[in-house]
């Protein structure tokens, strides 16, 4: 435990600038009533006033300077975001959710972009956007507020066990812990409105339960996904139908490019982009995501 340099008046920040203010310090034999910090500075000099324990012995507030912020008590608890791991009692702790935009050429074109010219771009969702979908079950997914054009986007999700900066593409897949199937749900009208106004469009992408996801399968169980049929059905009708080998940027390239902008870490997950034919759903619709090698993802809009 350590005493603070002085007893500050309520609302005053402690710094080399504010220590010059005129608030009185607690009286003591060395600091009679009415003594201010400026008086102490005149007597001892600035360095002495800042560093002398003798001149300010009467200050009584104490702080624990050795305690790590991570070990201190908090006023409330925040639940961690996790996703179950197939074949394990452990769960995967989600640190960040990265998403790549327009990563299939046909989808890029349907969104008004030229995939032959544009580099990859990424955005994020909050970790609590995760909505877990157990295999073999259908999960109710609430239709979100503020939208009249709610879209599905089926995607392969890569989960990282390690990370770093400027990861070489040749090393990128060694950082992958496993894979899952997910939906990047989108309030398309809000996204487009923000885009038209040149504003960030998180309101269209980064909202509650906007990231339904199945359980994570470890690489040892599935291998890496460089190809495979990926589909999204609505009420049994195929809406999206493509192959993972049609990605503009594969998973290894995505990891490498992302690490140029962010320090990737264990717990990060990457939604790897959606094929063409995204479209709207309404309450009562059943979405079924399919990917060869992973269980179906069944989500009902309510």
How does the language model describe each region?
Residues 69-91, 107, 134-137, 188-302:
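Catalytic-pocket segment enriched in acidic/His residues
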Residues 68-174:
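Extended, compositionally biased flexible segments
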Residues 166-202:
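Hydrophobic, well-structured mid-protein blocks that either form specific transmembrane helices
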Residues 96-98, 120-122, 155-157, 178-180, ...:
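Structural motif
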Residues 34-42, 50-70:
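N-terminal twin-arginine translocation
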Residues 117-119, 126, 152-156, 175-181, ...:
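A generic structural signal for short beta-strands and their flanking turns/coil linkers
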Residues 125, 154-156, 160-162, 180-185, ...:
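Short, structured patches in soluble enzyme cores that scaffold and shape functional sites
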Residues 1-36:
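N-terminal secretory signal peptides
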């Amino acid at each position: 435990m350590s005493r603070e340099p002085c007893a500050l008046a309520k609302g005053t920040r402690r710094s080399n600038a504010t220590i010059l203010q005129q608030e009185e310090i607690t009286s003591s034999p060395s600091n009679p009533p009415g003594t201010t910090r400026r008086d102490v500075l005149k007597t001892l000099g600035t360095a002495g006033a800042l560093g002398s324990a003798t001149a300010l012995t009467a200050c009584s507030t104490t702080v624990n300077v050795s305690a790590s912020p991570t070990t201190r008590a908090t006023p409330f608890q925040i639940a961690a975001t996790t996703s179950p791991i197939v074949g394990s009692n452990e769960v995967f702790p989600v640190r960040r959710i990265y998403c790549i935009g327009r990563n299939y050429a046909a989808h890029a074109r349907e969104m008004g972009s030229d995939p032959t010219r544009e580099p990859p771009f990424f955005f994020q969702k909050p970790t609590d956007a995760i909505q877990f979908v157990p295999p073999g079950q259908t999960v109710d997914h609430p239709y979100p507020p503020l939208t009249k054009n709610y879209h599905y986007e089926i995607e392969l999700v890569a989960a990282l066990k390690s990370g770093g900066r400027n990861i070489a593409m040749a090393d990128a897949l060694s950082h992958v812990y496993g894979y899952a199937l997910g939906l990047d749900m989108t309030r398309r009208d809000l996204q487009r409105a923000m885009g038209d106004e040149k504003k960030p469009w998180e309101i269209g992408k980064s909202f509650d339960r906007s990231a339904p996801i199945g359980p994570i399968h470890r690489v040892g169980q599935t291998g890496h996904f460089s190809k495979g049929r990926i589909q999204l059905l609505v009420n049994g009708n195929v809406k999206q139908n493509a192959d993972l080998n049609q990605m503009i940027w594969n998973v290894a390239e995505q990891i490498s490019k992302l690490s140029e902008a962010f320090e990737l870490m264990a717990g990060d997950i990457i939604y790897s982009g959606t094929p063409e034919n995204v479209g709207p759903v309404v309450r009562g619709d059943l979405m079924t995501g399919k990917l060869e090698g992973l269980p179906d993802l069944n989500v009902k809009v309510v």
